[in-house]
């Protein structure tokens, strides 16, 4: 590994970095990775130059950590493109598996990129990042820049030698500063009130469950009518809400109906930038946020409106709650409890454009890395509306969640979305 000799500066970690460095997510490998075969003419020197350009353009790829509270940013890249050769596909994949291992947080550099050459026109490319430095928006930005720098490199252009600014470092400084101002006090008051009203994060499952052995993940896929997406969009439009809030409301309403609990909650990952000027900064900004529904018989339209009103505030005041609570000396999170229910709409995955690197065609290689999160005590609702065959997929541990309760929840959620009585 090559490490720049000169540190640009030391400064505070962001709250997201603080959470990861304090042991949050330690039970999983915490990797974001993409492995793919590239067919065509690949210029290895151009790949090296392109990745150097990406790292110089985004300082989050050049950060290392002194402690959970202190980071340092280098002015040069922290690692170069690794190059290997292999005689067989099996050997190439075995080589890649050696680099898809968890990062040492006390080390320098939380990104790896490697190329394994099978022949002159076929290469296996692996890009591995720790989740501390990347979310979906960041990944897309990094890959777009990678393709652009590669195209420039094959035309003879070099990556810039000097970094104009360190955007993520500046963001971490701003975030820590704002927490000590009225901006921070406003968020502290909001999350204190949320905790007083709904309890600590994350919301628990409202039905009593008992583990009956080792976790056994199962999936249930329910086909939805061809016009399901149109129905969701129509309900969202009439409620003046979003399609996501509409399907989330369906899940919350089903929890309330099946459990009989007056107040129910779920979680969802929110891909938001919480401070002005952070829209284009690369780094981890996504956080899990709570969704709540209180007591009261309502029609679907009223339910969606209530949930939407609550999510506006939750998204606005979104922060890494465990880190913020530690700084504020507030108990906002139950660290030993998993979310009872999570909800997503048309979940995206980390991808790599089919022809992102000019002159090559990419084919994704599904690769399982031990240590992936399994959520043994979280019921996962995934609404898939983008394809030709809309469906609701639910993933759960069948040795923890009762099958009958899960089926009842699915049916109630579907009825909510498809109901004409809104």
Give residue spans per PLM region.
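Short amphipathic alpha-helices and their capping loops
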Residues: 1-25, 48-90, 109, 164-218
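A short, small/polar-residue-rich loop/turn motif at beta-strand boundaries
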Residues: 3-4, 40-56, 72-108, 227, ...
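Gly/Ser/Thr-rich phosphate-binding loops and adjoining beta-strand/alpha-helix segments
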Residues: 5-10, 27-46, 106-127, 209-273, ...
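Active-site-proximal acidic secondary-structure segment that organizes catalysis
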Residues: 5-6, 10-11, 86, 109-169, ...
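His-Asp-centered acyl/peptidyl-transfer active-site segments
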Residues: 6, 24-31, 48, 59-60, ...
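Generic structural signal for small/hydrophobic residues in well-ordered secondary structure
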Residues: 13-14, 47, 58, 113, ...
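Amphipathic alpha-helical regulatory segments at dimerization interfaces
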Residues: 49-57, 98-102, 132, 193, ...
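Extended, hydrophobic beta-loop-alpha segments that form or line the acyl/peptidyl-thioester binding
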Residues: 58, 62, 143, 262-269, ...
């Amino acid at each position: 590994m090559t490490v720049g000799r000169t540190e640009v500066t030391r400064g505070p970690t962001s709250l997201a970095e603080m959470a990861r460095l304090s042991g949050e997510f330690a039970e999983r490998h915490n990797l974001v990775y993409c492995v793919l075969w590239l067919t065509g003419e690949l210029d290895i020197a151009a790949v090296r130059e392109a990745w150097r350009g990406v790292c110089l353009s985004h300082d989050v790829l050049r950060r290392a950590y002194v402690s959970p509270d202190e980071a340092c940013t280098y002015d040069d890249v922290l690692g170069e493109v690794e190059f290997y050769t292999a005689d067989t596909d099996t050997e190439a994949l075995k080589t890649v598996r050696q680099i898809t291992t968890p990062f040492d947080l006390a080390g320098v550099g939380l990104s790896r990129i490697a190329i394994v050459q099978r022949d002159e026109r076929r290469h296996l490319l692996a890009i591995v990042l720790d989740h501390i430095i990347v979310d979906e928006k960041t990944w897309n930005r990094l890959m777009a820049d990678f393709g652009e720098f590669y195209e420039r490199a094959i035309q003879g252009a070099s990556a810039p030698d000097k970094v104009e600014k360190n955007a993520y470092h500046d963001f971490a400084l701003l975030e820590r500063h704002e927490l000590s101002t009225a901006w921070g006090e406003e968020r502290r008051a909001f999350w204190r009130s949320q905790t007083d009203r709904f309890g600590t994060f994350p919301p628990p499952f409202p039905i009593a469950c008992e583990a009956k052995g080792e976790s056994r993940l199962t999936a249930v896929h329910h086909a939805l009518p061809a016009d399901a997406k149109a129905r969701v969009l129509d309900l969202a439009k009439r409620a003046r809400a979003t399609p996501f809030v509409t399907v989330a409301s369906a899940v919350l309403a089903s929890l309330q109906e099946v459990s009989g609990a007056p107040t129910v909650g779920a979680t969802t990952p929110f891909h938001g930038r919480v401070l002005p000027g952070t829209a284009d900064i690369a780094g981890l900004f996504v956080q899990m946020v709570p969704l709540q529904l209180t007591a009261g018989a309502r029609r679907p339209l009223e339910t969606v409106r209530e949930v939407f009103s609550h999510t506006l505030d939750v998204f606005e005041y979104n922060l890494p709650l465990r880190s913020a609570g530690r700084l504020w000396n507030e108990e906002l999170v139950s660290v030993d409890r998993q979310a009872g229910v999570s909800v997503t709409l048309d979940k995206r995955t980390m991808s790599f454009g089919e022809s992102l690197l000019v002159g090559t065609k990419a084919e994704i290689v599904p690769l399982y890395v031990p240590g992936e999160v399994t959520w043994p005590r979280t019921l996962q609702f995934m609404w898939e509306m983008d394809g030709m065959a809309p469906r609701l997929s639910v993933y759960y541990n069948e040795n923890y969640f009762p099958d009958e309760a899960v089926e009842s929840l699915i049916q109630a959620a579907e009825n909510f979305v498809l109901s004409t009585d809104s």
